Amino acid sequence: EEKMDEYQIWSNMNSGLISNAIYFAGIAFLLWVAFRAANQMRAEDAGVLNKTLVSLFSLGIIFNGLFTGAVLFNILEGTAYSLAQLESMSAFSQAFVDAYGVNPPEAGMNIFTANPINTGWWLVITVMIFGRIWTKA
């Protein structure tokens, strides 16, 4: 069985981080759209149907944000696990493994527990958006 070398592992991690960042940029744009829509719902005193549609749109964005945060940790933990499988590694790689552990990444990652800070941040976003949609001015 042929294993990747240290450089290949770091390259794969960087590719994953770049992809994750691009995906998050799209989520950030859609989050801005959701806040604009929530503000519009409040300004127009919109009906229940419109508020429900904007709520569902916002929940989709929030789900994708949670998923992106979980994927980020999966990339980092997967990199640490791959580095730990090497026979020898640099001091920097060893420090990375020490920071993220040597457990294999979860196959069925939980978007709520993968990154508690990310989960808390998205909870605040959820309250902010739904507060704008469903409360009176």
Residue ranges and their predicted role:
Residues 2-35:
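Cytosolic-side membrane-entry/anchor segment at the start of a transmembrane helix
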Residues 6-15, 100-114:
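Membrane-interface segments at the starts/ends of alpha-helical transmembrane spans
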Residues 23-30, 55-65, 119-126:
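Hydrophobic alpha-helical transmembrane segments of multipass integral membrane proteins
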Residues 28-39, 111-137:
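Transmembrane alpha-helical segments in integral membrane proteins
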Residues 36-44, 72:
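Juxtamembrane helix-break-helix junctions at the cytosolic face
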Residues 42-58:
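Alpha-helical transmembrane segments and their helix-start/interface "positive-inside/aromatic belt" motifs
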Residues 53-80:
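Hydrophobic alpha-helical membrane-insertion segments
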Residues 71-99:
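Juxtamembrane non-transmembrane "cap" segments at the membrane-aqueous interface
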